[in-house]
Structure formats: structure tokens, C-alpha cells
């Protein structure tokens, strides 16, 4: 039996019927979600859930990343997607692609944290100063990914945790130290919950874990 067959057998024996994708932010790694995943794994009511780390390079074309992930979605399990920061943009983009092309995927919902759905005004300028840095083009307010995201909005049940603490003085409006509150609230048809944390504290908050547990068990 090869490694893939052994993995599939183990999954079957454990009775996985649901899969949760964790998509990290720009220049981050799956380590970002360690606290959240460990907390979820201790909940006996979530034994049916398989937790999967999604790794991507934010220097690659974001539209291509979204398309590849949508095509990779499991056909035999209910799917939930959780994303932090840019990972939330990717998560919503994947959900839109799955619904747009009527893919045979049982996508149950999306959870985002501190995500720049409205793009970044800073990136509008930085993309010209650093044209080799693809991330700035991806999250500029006029990028195709951002404009499509805002135009279509949430297409499945979506919970967006909006972080409001941090207040970087370099921004002209309320922000979490990295992303403005306005940008986090730019996704239509999402349910918003404000969290009194900065851009990174949300990842180690017990309140965040409770919101995720409630969402997973409800959908």
C-alpha cells in the first residue's frame, strides 16, 4: 500500500465526512492557525472534520491560485474554508469560483479574519514603486481579484471577523494595524462580527475559536 492509499484508508477509518481548509495570509505559513486548530481538535463534536493546511505563494498570480484551489476542492466531503488576511480573500474567491462554475462541491461556508476585501490603497502606490512584487498588484483596490470579489459578494454562508484594534497612524481611517476596517467590511452579503483585537491577535483569541466552532456546527 502506498502512502496515498494509507492516508485515504486512515481517513475512511476515522469517519471523516467534512473538511476544513485553513488558508494563511501573505508571507505567512500554516503555523498561524496552530492555536485555532489545536482548540478545534480537542472538541469531540468535531471528530468528523478533517483539518487541511493550504499553502500558497503570495508572489504568484492570485487569480491562478484561486482557480487551482477551486478545482482541487473535495467532491466527497462537505467543505468549509477559513482564511486569515489575504487568505480570506482567497477563500471567498474560491467559493465564488465553485458556485460560478457549478462545481460538484458541497461548500458549506466560509470564515474570514482581518481580510482586505476592499483592497489596499497603499498597494495602489506601492505596486508602481515595486513592480516586481506581485502581492501589491493583487491587493490594489483596482485589481481584478478585488473588484470581482466586491461585485459578486458572498455566495455561501460567510462569517467575517473584523479586527478593530491596532490603529496604525499611517492609515487615514480606523484599522487593525495592517488592514482598514472599511476594507474588511467591503464584502457584500457577509455576516460581520467586530473583534477588539489587532490583525494578528485574532489568531490566538478564545473568542475566535468560539465563533468558528459555532459556525461549523451550525452550517
Predicted segments with their positions:
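Short, surface-exposed "cap/lid" segments of acyl-processing enzymes
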Residues: 2-48
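Serine-dependent carboxylesterase/thioesterase catalytic core
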Residues: 20-24, 41, 46-54, 59-156, ...
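Residues that form or flank phosphate/diphosphate-binding pockets in enzymes
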Residues: 31, 60, 203
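Alpha-helical elements of Rossmann-like donor-binding domains used by nucleotide-donor carbohydrate transfer enzymes
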Residues: 35, 39, 64-68, 93, ...
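C-terminal catalytic-base region of ester-bond hydrolases, centering on the histidine
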Residues: 153-219
Amino acid at each position: 500500500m502506498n502512502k496515498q492509499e494509507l492516508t485515504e484508508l486512515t481517513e475512511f477509518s476515522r469517519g471523516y465526512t467534512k473538511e476544513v481548509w485553513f488558508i494563511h495570509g501573505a508571507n505567512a505559513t500554516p503555523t498561524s492557525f496552530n492555536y485555532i486548530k489545536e482548540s478545534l481538535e480537542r472538541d469531540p463534536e468535531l471528530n468528523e472534520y478533517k483539518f487541511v493546511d493550504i499553502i500558497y505563494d503570495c508572489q504568484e498570480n492570485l487569480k491562478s491560485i484561486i482557480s487551482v484551489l477551486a478545482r482541487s476542492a473535495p467532491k466527497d466531503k462537505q467543505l468549509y474554508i477559513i482564511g486569515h488576511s489575504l487568505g480570506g480573500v482567497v477563500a471567498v474567491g474560491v467559493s465564488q469560483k465553485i458556485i460560478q462554475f457549478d462545481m460538484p462541491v458541497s461548500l458549506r461556508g466560509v470564515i474570514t479574519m482581518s481580510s482586505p476585501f476592499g483592497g489596499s490603497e497603499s498597494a495602489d502606490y506601492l505596486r508602481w514603486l515595486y513592480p516586481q512584487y506581485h502581492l501589491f498588484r493583487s491587493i490594489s483596490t483596482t485589481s481584478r481579484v478585488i473588484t470581482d470579489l466586491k461585485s459578486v459578494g458572498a455566495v455561501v454562508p460567510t462569517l467575517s471577523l473584523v479586527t478593530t484594534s491596532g490603529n496604525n497612524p499611517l492609515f487615514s481611517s480606523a484599522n487593525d494595524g495592517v488592514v482598514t476596517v472599511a476594507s474588511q467590511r467591503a464584502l457584500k452579503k457577509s455576516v460581520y462580527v467586530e473583534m477588539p483585537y489587532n490583525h494578528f491577535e485574532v489568531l490566538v483569541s478564545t473568542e475566535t475559536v468560539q465563533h468558528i466552532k459555532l459556525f461549523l456546527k451550525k452550517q
